[in-house]
Curated annotation (Swiss-Prot):
This is Large ribosomal subunit protein uL3. One of its GO terms (biological process) is translation. It comes from the Bacteria. Pfam families: Ribosomal_L3 (PF00297). The gene is rplC. Part of the 50S ribosomal subunit. Forms a cluster with proteins L14 and L19. The modification N5-methylglutamine is found at Q151. One of the primary rRNA binding proteins, it binds directly near the 3'-end of the 23S rRNA, where it nucleates assembly of the 50S subunit. Residues 131-165 are annotated as: Disordered. Residues 135-150 have a biased composition (Polar residues). GO terms for molecular function: rRNA binding; structural constituent of ribosome. The keyword Transmembrane helix does not apply. Belongs to the universal ribosomal protein uL3 family.
Length: 242
């Protein structure tokens, strides 16, 4: 089981495939998605990684969180979340996950907070048909009608669909297709709609109901540090000289 990522919802647009068909996509952006802490079986009783994304002002970060980020040698993060992983896919603290963590064609599950709609009636909230428009109906055109039966059972059952607060809930949409990724800009293009408003934080994970593609990097797609890049460049230069 691999780690997921935290991304920010930018909005929706459309792209075209090789045959000229347009595909509606949601654009998600990863901004400095780094491992902030580890959770191990020996110390915590489970295995997970804590990721942080975005940048937060130091003055708006609590003293406890400043110490937490300093221990990981990362800048203060705007959003922090944990992802359960298998022991072999545990990531080092400070590692940065890139957008090519997911591959085109892969299925993912996305989790976000749906847009709040406030108090709504049953026609909008539950897609009820409403009452009659004429023939004796007055002031009851959009009501839900009866909510119970008679003296027995003499109550309204729990879960009855009625008017109430709509939206602003944690929603997970499963099996969305990754259309493409842009590592340089940290973009993930996902087919279809993603719950949440523009600017909201979205958790993106490997789909639990679809197999992981063989091309998916394990344990994750990690951005090479400057030191590693310099070593790789020096090695390549040495091989070229030989």
């Amino acid at each position: 089981m691999r780690s997921g990522v935290i991304a920010q919802k930018i909005g929706m647009t459309r792209v075209y495939n090789e045959t000229g068909e347009h595909i509606p996509v949601t654009v998600l952006r990863m901004e400095n998605c780094q491992v902030v802490a580890q959770r191990t079986e020996e110390k915590n009783g489970y295995t997970a990684v804590q990721l942080g994304v975005g940048l937060a002002k130091v003055k708006n970060t609590s003293k406890a969180l400043r110490g937490h980020f300093a221990a990981a040698s990362v800048e203060p993060k705007a959003k922090v979340a944990e992802f359960r992983v298998s022991p072999e896919n545990l990531l080092d603290v400070g590692a940065e996950i890139t957008a090519d963590h997911f591959v085109p064609g892969q299925k993912v599950d996305v989790t976000g907070t749906s847009i709040g709609k406030g108090f709504q009636g049953v026609m909008k909230r539950h897609n009820f048909g409403g009452g009659r428009a004429t023939h004796g109906n007055s002031v009851s055109h959009r009501t839900h009608g009866s909510t119970g039966q008679r003296q027995d059972p003499g109550k309204v059952f729990k879960g009855k669909k009625m008017a109430g607060h709509m939206g602003d809930r944690r929603v997970t949409t499963q099996n969305l297709e990754v259309v493409s990724t842009d590592t340089e800009r940290g973009l993930i293009l996902v087919r279809g709609a993603v719950p949440g408003s523009k600017g909201s934080w979205i958790m993106v994970r490997d789909a639990v109901k679809a197999p992981l593609p063989k091309e998916a990097p394990l344990p994750a797609a990690i951005r090479a540090s400057n030191n590693n890049a310099e070593k790789a460049a020096a090695t390549a230069a040495g091989e070229g000289a030989e």
